[in-house]
Design a protein with these regions (language model features):
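A general structural signal for well-ordered alpha-helical segments in protein cores
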Residues: 18-21, 46, 50, 71, ...
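Conserved C-terminal alpha-helix-loop-beta "cap" of PLP-dependent enzymes
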Residues: 74-128
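PLP-dependent enzyme catalytic core of the Aspartate aminotransferase-like
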Residues: 104, 108-158
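Glycine- and other small-residue-rich loops at beta-strand/loop junctions that grip anionic moieties
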Residues: 13, 20, 38, 75-76, ...
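Structural signature of PLP-dependent enzymes
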Residues: 28-51, 60-70
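Hydrophobic C-terminal alpha-helix "anchor/cap" residues
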Residues: 53-54, 90
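Conserved core segment of the aminotransferase class I/II
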Residues: 1-36
Length: 158
């Protein structure tokens, strides 16, 4: 049990970190001011990645709604390959995942994909890709190239 000091009226221990509290407020204000610009940038990066991959990989499938989704996240199923194998092939150029961190070694179909009606074959090729506010067009293009190359290498070897 922790007890507060007199300056906290005995309610909580420690003293508030005023500098960090003020910094958090400033950071929140700056984030709010750039929200529209950031969302627009994320959307442009995500869509460039999606359209580039779709143009290079036949039968690539989007998992989720085409319009009602986060501006920074892309969840795709790469046909005829394991998502895990695809990412292993592209690991030098792309940091991505095939599932949540708590299930990173589990190859079972995720409950979310199953609820969406995605079958096991399509789910096996599922990969989640995300962009950030600092992501550049060049980085997206390198990721597209690496994923396309990895898909062709894995798809033709199976």
């Amino acid at each position: 049990v922790l007890f507060g000091a007199d300056q906290e009226h005995g309610l909580r221990p420690g003293t508030e970190n005023v500098a960090s509290i003020v910094a958090l407020g400033v950071a929140a204000k700056l984030a709010a001011e750039s929200l529209a610009t950031t969302a627009s940038h994320l959307l442009a990066m995500r869509d460039r990645l999606h359209h580039g991959l779709a143009a290079s990989i036949p039968d690539l499938q989007l998992n989720g709604h085409l319009a009602q989704r986060l501006p920074n996240t892309l969840h795709l199923s790469f046909p005829g390959v394991s998502g895990r194998a695809l990412l292993a092939e592209a690991a030098d150029a792309v940091a991505a995942s095939v599932g949540s961190a708590c299930h990173s070694e589990n190859d079972a179909v995720s409950g979310v994909l199953a609820a969406m009606g995605i079958d096991a074959t399509r789910a096996a090729g599922a990969v989640r890709l995300s962009v950030g506010r600092m992501t550049t067009f060049d980085e997206v293009d390198r990721a597209m190239e690496a994923l396309t190359k990895a898909w062709h290498a894995r798809h033709t070897s199976q």
